[in-house]
Amino acid sequence: MVQELFLHNINQNKRNKKMYQLAQINVARMIGTNIEDPVMNEFVSHLDSVNRLAEESDGFIWRLKDDENNATSFNPFNDEQIIINISVWKDIESLEYYTYKTFHVDFVRRRKEWFQKYGKAYYALWWIKDKEYPTTDEAMKRLEYLQEKGSSSYAFNFQSVFQKP
């Protein structure tokens, strides 16, 4: 009887424990006037392969995209020079591996060839409940918070990671 009660409590705790996944937003202001500007050609020519790499990476869950598999069509600022990327990952390690240990890192290193400086922070990370996906409004609020107030459990970066709730 005691063992059954113990096992029941363990199973109940597992059911009550909320699972979390990592959301990220990355915002960039292009050097070009818009995504079709010739200065952006090389960057744009690699978007499909970089996005495919993300989608095939361990830990990848979801990314913001339209019906044509395009993320550059979203424009929450009503500014053609700004592009956003929002995605969801299983954990910090998965996103960090994709970002810095695959050919994606080449684009991080070459960022200044295509993009201007964007505020104090151009990306933000935060934890969301499993099976939930961030809206552009929510993601922008997280980034704005990080820019204005710095890292916290509400929004953080790779240098100051907050653990899952």
Where are these regions (language model features)?
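An amphipathic, aromatic/His-enriched active-site/gating alpha helix that lines ligand/cofactor pockets
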Residues: 92-120
